[in-house]
Amino acid sequence: MVIMGNELQLENKILKGTTTVGIRVNDGVILAADRRASAGFFVANKMVRKVLYITDKIGITTAGSVADLQFIYDVLKNIYHYNSITKYGPISIKGIATRLANVLSATKYFPYIVQILIGGYDDQPRLFNLDYLGDITEENYVATGSGSPVAMGVLEDEYNPKMTLDEAADLAKRAVFSAIKRDSFTGTGVIVAKIHSKGHEELEFYLNKKM
């Protein structure tokens, strides 16, 4: 896709400042992200949370404008809870991703500056990647943000759909740490979420425990 003018500026805002990773295997989904927030070349915050949860079995990773991401996170929670109290019952992960894609597509001329991974477990593990235009793809593994070229190289080299959830968690951790070493907008440490049929577990890893 050729990006020009304002679209290039938006793309740069989304790419600069984070690295997130998603991996899908038979037992569940891994979501991982670093903890650094940048304002230009300034490190604005060293302990930002970029892995969030809609339910115990559905999570997201975030990249982009903080204000837009907070709004979109509220939208996602409202979509899930609204469906849960209606006759339709709980919405699927694919349904949530599709609804968000519709929201983003409808506002593409005045877009929310976001890049979202939605992953979780309903009747099976699912992982979706959405950009600010509402484009949606289902993935087995994916990386977003400024460190994504480095992280994606690790994933491409080592991903195996038959790997266990623990092995996938270790791969995601190493992919983000590889980005931390090479990308100045990615840093501090990594949050890794393991989402499976019984819920989720979260692990944290840091370059320096005193940070």
Swiss-Prot record:
SUPFAM superfamilies registered for this protein in UniProt: N-terminal nucleophile aminohydrolases (Ntn hydrolases)
Active site (UniProt): 18 (nucleophile)
BP GO annotations: proteasomal protein catabolic process
Domain of life according to the entry: Archaea
Cellular component terms (Gene Ontology): cytoplasm; proteasome core complex, beta-subunit complex
Recorded catalytic activity of this chain's protein: Cleavage of peptide bonds with very broad specificity
Gene3D superfamilies: Glutamine Phosphoribosylpyrophosphate, subunit 1, domain 1
Propeptide: 1-17
Enzyme Commission numbers on file: 3.4.25.1
Coiled coil as UniProt keyword: no
Activity regulation, per record: The formation of the proteasomal ATPase PAN-20S proteasome complex, via the docking of the C-termini of PAN into the intersubunit pockets in the alpha-rings, triggers opening of the gate for substrate entry. Interconversion between the open-gate and close-gate conformations leads to a dynamic regulation of the 20S proteasome proteolysis activity.
rRNA processing keyword on record: no
GO molecular-function terms, A-Z: threonine-type endopeptidase activity
Compartment(s): Cytoplasm
Top-level class of the enzyme under EC nomenclature: hydrolase
Keywords on record: Autocatalytic cleavage, Cytoplasm, Hydrolase, Protease, Proteasome, Threonine protease, Zymogen
Function: Component of the proteasome core, a large protease complex with broad specificity involved in protein degradation.
Similarity comment: family membership: Belongs to the peptidase T1B family.
Assembly, per entry: The 20S proteasome core is composed of 14 alpha and 14 beta subunits that assemble into four stacked heptameric rings, resulting in a barrel-shaped structure. The two inner rings, each composed of seven catalytic beta subunits, are sandwiched by two outer rings, each composed of seven alpha subunits. The catalytic chamber with the active sites is on the inside of the barrel. Has a gated structure, the ends of the cylinder being occluded by the N-termini of the alpha-subunits. Is capped at one or both ends by the proteasome regulatory ATPase, PAN.
Name assigned to this protein: Proteasome subunit beta 2
